[in-house]
């Protein structure tokens, strides 16, 4: 079963050179984590509402149109107060699409709830591990930028192909790719924030949020495959 669909995110400062860690970078990081926490809670609430009311999955095309439309709007409004409203609209929409996915796994597997919790736990472990490395490491990870951008685009296109042509093996490969790519993106983006390569906390929040979304859905897909449907 593969009801998840990876989403991609364009980001700025790809391949930019890191700067010395500054107080400005620390401030952006604090603001990013604060906004990320709020959007995750809001998205989780919307996912719960969607799941509790058994709302149907809107479909790949509607999901992608809604996501990219709200992403474009948020990018345009990123330097204004309306950018905050827009990012909540974006993450809330993604939460709504998550509800039916979670319901599908809970309904299809006798241990569906356990699979969901394992995917959540795995996502948390990857996020905190990669964030920790970015915060304490003195290594320069800016070289990862271009490779991540290309890899994400390739995986995204392959993911669409797996969905439309019903190719389970390719779908599993894409999920594995996205786990690695999103782990790398969290590492890269976090270092960009603290080194001054990313100065807009709204855009930084989107990148980290989308990374977490893709990590969770990809892990859930792999766990579901290895668990086997009842």
Predicted regions span which residues?
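A hydrophobic alpha-helical transmembrane-helix feature that marks the membrane cores
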Residues: 1-230
